[in-house]
Swiss-Prot record, chain A:
One CC-aspect GO term: kinetochore
Protein name listed in UniProt: Centromere protein M
One Pfam family from the record: CENP-M
Domain of life: Eukaryota
Keyword hit for Transcription: no
Length: 180, 319
């Protein structure tokens, strides 16, 4: 099993690769389809994985952004993400990791409290996004957003880096360190 | 004709009920019209049989002819539907004065029975009847849930006696779909109804997703996905699952916990707990759990044994 490192491979020409990690394959697949339909000047590649570590592969391109998808309806999905986080190189957490929580809209089905994922994202100093992936319009909007994030993390947007992005996003959505 | 063959003829013909006798003898077509006319069919059955065996001897019947007759007897439905209906109705009416019983013959040798129950003092309630479907070629009957549970033993008794069985057992299998119950009980669910292209790749076979996979999407855990698909297919098969709405597990087991200590862990008596799964189509939902990533494959045998065991209500105790 190889550990994923953010900068151990050369980037492909105009290529941006995102890795979606989550237990529910159907959701990841739908999100991937939506992302590929979004407007994008770069060439996109989407990798889907159930958990980390990934199986060994020489042909894998450099991963620019990792999004961990947690379904608030399923304790198993949170547990799997928590276990996967241990297998990630620390350098990724400098703006190349994001958390996505789905299922918040159906409160009666939620078995994970919102604060749990908020704390998780805070622990790993990464942005947290909420989106009900089952609803097509929300998913399309989130897909567009992720594509923009991905382009920045891949360095395709001049003047903005992944690290810049981190501090920008923290201000608007996530509470600062003092608040929690 | 030798002794054993004559005896075989005697016993085979004796088994035929008088109502079917002429039909079977004519289908067998071994004894001619003239010969049959010489037999007096009004005497006692033993005498009729004796006369018929003598005729067989005259015609030098062989073992083949005897076997042929035996096959015909098995083939023709020897179940007397009219007798069943009248016996069933009599039993209910003798026990309960106020009851309405009606019948309708249906396909596959089945009879639909409608029963409106009353009590000793009240007339039958025609608005809340119970329905029973009995398949005469099988030892199975299906009933709709009757609001008057107290009449179930009587119904069971009537079915048992009228169908000439010794006892009736209530199965722990319930569903709103008669066809699905039939499929499970007659073990007909594991036949594919559509032609299936066996060379379809595993990916296309899953849940309707991935039909035209974009080459820009790469599954990192392809090997695991294929394993899950394979295991699911081995357990559930390719065919559509019979339709059930519930699976209920009544647990009477000792509480087990990972945490050391805790109040419940120290209890000696079993903890009573009811777990109920409900779905518009339970078995299809269970089938899709592992491929969707919600559960690990293979699933617990408690869930996968439902069609095999013909049960969806379970009681589980510690061994």
């Amino acid at each position: 099993m190889s550990a994923l490192r953010p900068l151990d491979k050369l980037p492909g020409l105009n290529t941006a690769t995102i890795l979606l990690v989550g237990t529910e394959d159907a959701l990841l697949q739908q999100l991937a389809d939506s992302m590929l339909k979004a407007d994008c000047t770069s060439e996109l590649k989407v990798h889907l994985a159930r958990s980390l570590p990934l199986p060994c592969s020489v042909n894998r391109p450099r991963i620019d952004l990792i999004v961990f998808v947690v379904n608030l309806h399923s304790k198993l999905s949170l547990q799997s993400v928590e276990e996967s986080l241990c297998h990630l190189d620390a350098a990724f957490f400098l703006g190349k990791v994001a958390f996505l929580a789905t299922g918040a809209g159906r409160d009666s089905h939620c078995s994970i409290h919102r604060n749990t994922v908020v704390k998780l994202a805070h622990t790993y100093r990464s942005p947290l996004l909420f989106c009900d992936l089952e609803i097509e319009d929300f998913r399309a909007a989130m897909a567009q957003r992720l594509v923009r994030l991905l382009q920045i993390c891949a360095g395709h947007v001049p003047g903005v880096s992944a690290l810049n992005l981190l501090s920008l996003m923290r201000g608007s959505e996530n509470p600062s360190l003092e608040d929690l | 004709m030798d002794e054993t063959l004559a005896e075989f003829f005697r016993r085979t013909i004796l088994k035929i009920p008088m109502t079917e006798m002429m039909t079977i003898l004519k289908t067998w077509n071994f004894l001619s019209e003239n010969q049959l006319q010489t037999v007096n069919f009004r005497q006692r059955k033993e005498s009729i049989v004796q006369d018929l065996v003598l005729l067989c001897e005259e015609n030098r019947a062989s073992l083949n002819d005897a076997a042929h007759l035996d096959i015909i007897c098995d083939d023709i439905d020897l179940f007397d539907m009219e007798q069943f209906k009248s016996s069933f109705k009599k039993i209910l009416q003798r026990a309960l004065k106020n009851v309405t019983v009606s019948f309708r013959d249906a396909e596959e040798n089945s009879v639909w029975i409608r029963i409106a129950w009353g009590t000793q003092y009240k007339k039958p309630n025609q608005y809340k009847p119970a329905y029973v479907v009995y398949y005469s070629q099988t030892p199975y009957a299906f009933t709709s849930s009757s609001r008057l549970k107290s009449n179930l033993p009587l119904l069971g008794q009537a079915l048992t006696v009228a169908s000439k069985h010794h006892q009736i057992v209530k199965m722990d299998l319930r569903s709103r779909y008669l066809d699905s119950l039939k499929a499970i009980v007659f073990k007909q669910y594991n036949q594919s109804f559509e032609t299936h292209n066996c060379t379809t790749s595993l990916q296309e076979g899953s849940l309707g997703l991935n039909i035209n996979m974009d080459s820009r999407i790469i599954h990192e855990n392809k090997v695991e996905k294929e394993r899950v698909q394979r295991v699911t297919q081995e357990i559930f098969g390719d065919y559509p699952q019979p339709r059930l709405e519930f699976a209920q597990y009544k647990l009477e087991t000792k509480f087990k916990s990972d945490l050391n200590g805790g109040i419940l862990a120290e209890r000696e008596e079993p903890l009573r707990c009811l777990v109920k799964f409900s779905s518009p189509h339970l078995l299809e939902a269970l089938k899709s759990l592992a491929p969707a990533g919600i559960a690990d494959a293979p699933l617990s045998p408690l869930l996968t044994c439902i069609p095999n065991k013909g049960k969806n209500y379970f009681k589980i105790r510690d061994k």
